[in-house]
Regions:
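Residue-level signal for inorganic ion chemistry
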Residues: 29, 33, 146, 206, ...
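Rossmann-like NAD(P) dinucleotide-binding subdomain of oxidoreductase/dehydrogenase enzymes
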Residues: 94, 103-241, 245
């Protein structure tokens, strides 16, 4: 059997198993679905040290390949990030059951009532880059909503994804749900992604979570409906009536909390009436943190920094760089 045929056969098996498991999961009670999330959280806590040591191996390999600092940041796991994974699972477990919820009740002139009911989609394919915590986050949301999932993480996080997936399997087994409710593509072969996007017999929707290139590739190649996002060029606007200290704290946190995530601020907009009083102290604060600042002409009149060019207003830096405009 050729390599390509082996990949196709492997991916079809994963898709078929996920589809079969989705029928069981769709009928599972909310108590059982919540129990699976609680047991997964428990398994992650019990395997914390293994997860951290395995993640170190991924980090070492990534550094050997001279992967950029933004990706390294997204790849890294530590105790705080594992705590966030565990708390995220518990938060999802505590959410109301979305399955079977009735919305938009519309009576008709004939007396017939038309309602919308939330039901599971079936099997969700999720393709993501770098961040191993997405393995737990994505699985949690799918399980809560009664959907099986087929996960394909980035090759740089393969070892971390596998150890977290093992925790997912333990939680599913303990809750009595099929372990195939959450499938992980264990090969880093790019052919697997292309094959996944052609599994329209088994998958009902595909969700990409990553950079513009990944989203575009999936949009172009997929035979399956795609739920996608756009560039993460996040802006913060400080209005003239804003509390100065609170505005500074929010802007500083929005940029420096984590540089390498799509939710990080890339452009700061400041109302002209408060720019003179706000900018000097705010720029000093950013500079003390090592953030490179790029400003418009009006900004340069108030604080010394690099002159921004037109591309800066449409760039997702994923780095300690910030554009400021008045």
């Amino acid at each position: 059997m050729s390599h390509s045929k082996e990949i196709i056969s492997y991916m079809n098996r994963l898709g078929s198993e996920a589809k079969d498991a989705s029928s069981v999961l769709a009928q599972a009670s909310i108590e059982q679905r919540n129990a699976s999330l609680d047991f997964i959280a428990e398994a992650i806590e019990l395997n914390r040290d293994k997860i951290l040591s395995t993640n170190q191996k991924d980090l070492e390999l990534a550094k050997q390949k001279s992967i950029g600092s933004a990706l390294i940041d997204r790849l890294e796991l530590n105790d705080n990030r594992i705590d966030s994974m565990i708390s995220g699972l518990k938060i999802v477990s505590d959410l109301p059951d979305p399955v079977g919820e009735i919305t938009d009740l519309d009576p008709t002139p004939s007396g017939i009532e038309v309602k919308k009911m939330r039901v599971p989609l079936g099997v969700v394919g999720i393709i993501y880059e770098s961040r191993p915590n997405v393995t737990a986050d994505a699985a949690a949301l799918c399980l809560k909503s009664g959907n099986s999932c087929l996960l394909r993480g980035g090759s740089e996080a393969i070892l971390s994804n596998k150890i977290i997936w093992n925790c997912l399997q333990k939680g599913l087994n303990k809750s009595g749900l099929p372990k195939e409710c959450v499938q992980l593509v264990e090969t880093t072969d790019r052919e697997a992604v292309k094959t996944l996007l052609h599994l329209d017999e088994y998958l009902d929707v595909v969700i990409p979570r990553g950079g513009k290139g990944l989203v575009q590739l999936i949009s172009d190649e997929s035979r399956i409906p795609v739920i996608k996002h756009l560039d993460g060029i996040c802006h913060v606007f400080i209005d003239k009536d804003a509390d100065h200290q609170k505005a500074q704290d929010i802007a500083f946190n929005a940029k420096t909390y984590r540089y390498g995530i799509c939710g990080a601020m890339e452009t700061l907009l400041i109302h002209s009436e408060i720019a003179n009083s706000l900018l000097p102290s705010l720029t000093k604060r950013f500079e003390s943190e090592g953030v490179e600042l790029r400003g418009c002409d009006k900004t340069l009149e108030i604080s010394e920094m690099i002159a921004a060019n037109e591309d800066d207003w449409s760039t997702e830096y994923l780095a300690p760089i910030l554009s400021i405009k008045i």
